[in-house]
């Protein structure tokens, strides 16, 4: 729990246990060291990966992503989630990590082979799959002949980029916002926008536009010096208001589809929002609206009577990657290590309110997996650790 739920590193967990042991007057007798904790995590994670705790045999969907990388290594992960909408946006407790493998690159054929191996352990194919718009993943889904939902967040961001990325007004505004970084050491630093990301910029456009809208709405409250430096904001008021309205509409549609499930009813509500909020707007808004409508119609075609409400977001796997990044080695040449085996444990220990007694389960995990099993798994699924090779060569 200290590592998986609280986010402690094995070193930090060792110190926490030592403090607790001292405060509780030696109740633990002897607290484990960080290497022991790391070994326990690897054994438990491997057992969880190979012996799923949840029963999703009847119907499941698969979420895949290979967007996390360290150096020249890419990690491909497959998540198993309920095929039917769970009544809420997916959480870690709804998921099972069913496959992980590291490679230098992931072509469509390699992804297909990976998925074939994963599916063979599950008994039958998923009812549908969800992934981002990576060409390799899309092609792999075609080769596998799976129903394939394009993740709603990534796809909507792609549409926004298609409409605005090369638009002269947007390019000018984005450049002017970027130039405000020279104010970082001035008395106006408190008014600076958040840093614009170079990767997935259009997925993270909301904070920048929210900032622009806030400056615009409060421009009259700025002093003369501040107005001078941010005078480009009212000059671009039309574009800022347009983006703010469009992104609000997009966010509302995504909230419906994520929190209430993707269904014919959700599509109808999304279409209504688009027609009311975006169709009356400027040419760019109408172009974006058409792309959104086409997406909703195409994805609705993948729904079927038996499972009429689908999950359509891969946010949960992005959250999983976020938890992994917190425990990754800081040295890039180390690549991916056995620390990735902590990810399967998150579905068990993600909810502190869960009163389930996992002690017997964890005990079984530790007894069922050995260090030898972990070593074998690393040889099959991870690439050689170049940091170890460096130490050997330069010893």
Can you name each region flagged by the protein language model?
Residues 131-143, 179-395:
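Acidic/histidine-rich catalytic cores and adjacent linkers
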Residues 1-3, 22-25, 95-100, 302-306, ...:
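Glycine- and acidic
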Residues 1-11:
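Short, amphipathic alpha-helical "recognition" segments used to contact nucleic acids or chromatin
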Residues 153-178, 314-319:
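RNase H-like two-metal-ion nuclease catalytic core shared by retroviral integrases
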Residues 25-129, 135, 139-154, 162, ...:
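RNase H-like nuclease fold core
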Residues 11-27:
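DNA-recognition alpha helix
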Residues 11, 35, 334-335:
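Short, solvent-exposed positions on alpha-helices
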């Amino acid at each position: 729990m200290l590592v998986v739920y609280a986010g402690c590193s094995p070193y930090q967990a060792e110190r926490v246990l030592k403090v607790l042991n001292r405060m509780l007057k030696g109740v633990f007798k002897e607290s484990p060291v960080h290497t022991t904790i790391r070994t326990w995590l690897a054994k438990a994670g491997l057992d969880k990966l190979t012996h799923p705790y949840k029963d999703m045999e009847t119907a499941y969907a698969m979420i895949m992503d290979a967007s996390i990388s360290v150096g020249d290594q890419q990690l491909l992960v497959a998540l198993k989630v309920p095929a039917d909408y769970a009544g809420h946006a997916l959480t870690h407790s709804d998921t099972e990590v069913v496959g992980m493998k590291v490679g230098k690159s992931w072509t469509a054929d390699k992804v297909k082979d990976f998925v074939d191996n994963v599916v063979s352990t599950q008994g039958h194919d998923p009812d549908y799959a969800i992934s981002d718009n990576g060409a390799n993943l899309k092609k792999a889904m075609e080769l596998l002949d799976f129903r394939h939902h394009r993740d709603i967040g990534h796809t909507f961001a792609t549409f926004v980029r298609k409409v605005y990325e090369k638009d002269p007004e947007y390019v000018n505004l984005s450049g002017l916002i970027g130039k405000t970084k020279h104010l970082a050491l001035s008395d106006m630093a408190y008014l600076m926008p958040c840093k614009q990301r170079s990767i997935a910029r259009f997925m993270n456009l909301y904070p920048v536009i929210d900032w622009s809208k806030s400056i615009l709405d409060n421009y009259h409250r700025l002093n003369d010096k501040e107005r001078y430096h941010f005078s480009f904001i009212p000059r671009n008021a039309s574009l800022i208001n347009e983006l703010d309205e469009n992104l609000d509409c997009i966010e509302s549609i995504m909230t419906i589809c994520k929190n209430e499930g993707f269904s014919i009813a959700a599509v109808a509500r999304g279409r209504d929002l688009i027609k009311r909020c975006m169709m009356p707007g400027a040419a760019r808004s109408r172009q974006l609206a058409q792309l959104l409508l086409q997406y909703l119609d195409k994805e609705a075609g993948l729904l079927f009577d038996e499972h009429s409400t689908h999950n359509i977001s891969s946010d949960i796997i992005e959250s999983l990657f976020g938890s992994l990044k917190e425990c990754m080695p800081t040295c890039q040449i180390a690549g991916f290590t056995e620390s990735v085996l902590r990810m399967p444990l998150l579905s068990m220990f993600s909810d502190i309110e869960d009163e389930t007694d996992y002690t017997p389960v964890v005990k079984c995990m530790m007894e069922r997996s050995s260090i030898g099993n972990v070593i074998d798994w690393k040889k099959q699924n991870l690439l050689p650790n170049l940091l170890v090779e460096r130490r050997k060569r330069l010893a």
